[in-house]
Amino acid sequence: MKRINILNEDTANKIAAGEVVERPASVVKELIENSIDANAKNIIIEIEEGGISLIRIIDDGDGIYKDDIAKAFLPHATSKIQESEDIYNIHTLGFRGEALPSIASVGKVNLKSKQDEEAFGYEISIEGGKASEVTECGINKGTILEVQDLFFNVPARKKFLKSVSKESSLINDIVTRLSLANPKISFKLYNNHKKVLHTFGNGDLKDVIRTIYGKSITDNILYFSDSSDLITVYGYVGTEEIARGSRNNQSIFVNRRYIKNRALAIAVEQAFKSFSTVNKFPFFILFIEVYPEYVDVNIHPTKAEIKFNDERMIFKKIFGAVHTALKNEVFETFAIKEEENTKKEPLPTFEEITFKIKEEEEKVKFASSAAKTLISQGKDLKANNESSFKSVYDPSLNNINKTIVEESTDYNKENEEPISIPVDLKPNSYIENLVDDYSDNAEDEIKSNSEPIENVITENKYENIKPNPIAKFPPITIIGQYNKTYILGEYDGTLYMIDQHAAHEKILFEKYLKEIEEGTIIIQPLIVPSIIDLSIDDYSYFEENKDIFREAGFLLEEFGGSSLSLKEVPYFLGRLNPKNLFLDILDNLKNLGNGKTSEVKHNAIATKACKAAIKGNDKLEMNEMIKLIEDLRYIDDPFHCPHGRPVIIKFTSIDIDKKFKRII
């Protein structure tokens, strides 16, 4: 057996340098962060041959005390903290005291520094870890640090460096990130004596963005912000016009520290996808300001990753801020006059609408708390419908006027019978039977009657209007239907095109999402429980979030090992595979880190709303188009479907005149 040896200082420093000094860009990052911590207002970075031959950092910061210049290159020597408790209250970018000794062990270093009250500056040189005497020198206030011939004594590390152009590009990238994080500091970057970057340090973040990314990017970004007692998030997110196929144009800063965090990036991306149809990554610059004690920056050698005390809370704050900014931008495009928005709507009249509903596998979905009771009792609903309904009916559920007639609208394309839009089902309507959606293979499954039904429903449109409704777009006049897919309308010289499927889909989506948020979830017992086998990791995540599943309407019991027995599931939007629904929500929780019940169900609701909505190629009558558009005007976001596709587009008279060359 080999004996244990104590490594000498030179070997230990080279090992430590392997973690901190990965490449020239790592050196540049550490030295610039030291300049920022020294309150520099102007920082000049000069590199040659990709930083391998020379890295020079010049700043006008506070400088270093004469007696501390030699100490600065000792391992774990730092001015940032004094005791272990300070690690959890970090206000500076550096704190470990590892960067300078690590750099000095693998490069030829020269440091000059002067404080404002000193008459002279002081200089020290270190080569391969061996330091010279500290001597006087002439220098302005601040610090100049040069690193030459990087990795001259570690040829194995030097061999793994990329090309000069690639190393230069990596240095340029880190300097631009630090410039974004510090708009009050002027940065100048010179590559082989050629200036490649110059920010002006005027404190305007948008000026820095324009300098780095150009005018086209700056003209297509939106500001977002949100704050609470514990956290503030703000920044800029790009429109889909500047989305890219990679995440290179994404920057995240926590307390001005540049980090990489996939979960936080996904928060922005998920909000972006709600308003975009392109399969690309959004441009964004995200700033998070949080109390230092709520983050741990001491978990990564280069401090590129940090740990949050409550990442889910931060995720939701970011998602909400970005989503609101993008939504407001769309709303402004369709903004209506104040008088149009506040004027009193005329009282609607009752109108008789006949809906012919042909029989499919499921006739009518009965959405009330009565569903669970009636299923468990297994009574004959046809014979006892009215009495059973009255015995379990809860008036607090708004007279059960939220029933959805799903996938029951079939129309004869040869005769072009009108497709119907789902309306409220009155409590005294006859219900032939209630089908158990989740027990296709169960012997006790209730069989559906095959007789078609025809309902004449009296609809009070006023019941659906909220108090003081706010319309999101003007009251357009319906012109007609184009290609049995798009509804055409006009208002004040502007032509509107509405995707009828996307419009109806979004109406259904928001309706069901609201019901879930209000807690009126209907529970569907399974006749035959479903056994779900989970991995150890998935089971642990379920244990951590079991309350979320219970609130979402799942009844799950342990079934030995990491298996679960699924006995009850939420009932919404018709037929769903209960096992797949559970696993989808579990994956959503793992990927997004979001614990809000309605949000983890987002994808499932969107999918079912899509299937339940009227389709393209469905002919609509004029009164149906009017009703659909009127309902669309008053939902929260009528401009995008749940999948991010646009619902409405508009053309001004100028746009159309340009197409016909009437104006140039």
Curated annotation (Swiss-Prot):
PROSITE patterns (UniProt xref): DNA_MISMATCH_REPAIR_1 (PS00058)
Lineage: Bacteria, Bacillati, Bacillota, Clostridia, Eubacteriales
Keyword field: DNA damage, DNA repair
GO biological process, one term: mismatch repair
Chain's role: This protein is involved in the repair of mismatches in DNA. It is required for dam-dependent methyl-directed DNA mismatch repair. May act as a 'molecular matchmaker', a protein that promotes the formation of a stable complex between two or more DNA-binding proteins in an ATP-dependent manner without itself being part of a final effector complex.
Recorded GO CC terms: mismatch repair complex
UniProt-recorded Gene Ontology molecular function terms: ATP binding; ATP hydrolysis activity; ATP-dependent DNA damage sensor activity; mismatched DNA binding
Organism: Clostridium beijerinckii (strain ATCC 51743 / NCIMB 8052) (Clostridium acetobutylicum)
Keyword DNA-binding: no
Domain of life where this protein originates: Bacteria
Family: Belongs to the DNA mismatch repair MutL/HexB family.
Gene3D superfamilies per UniProt: 3.30.230.10, Histidine kinase-like ATPase, C-terminal domain, MutL, C-terminal domain, dimerisation subdomain, MutL, C-terminal domain, regulatory subdomain
Keyword DNA repair: yes
Name listed for the protein in its UniProt record: DNA mismatch repair protein MutL
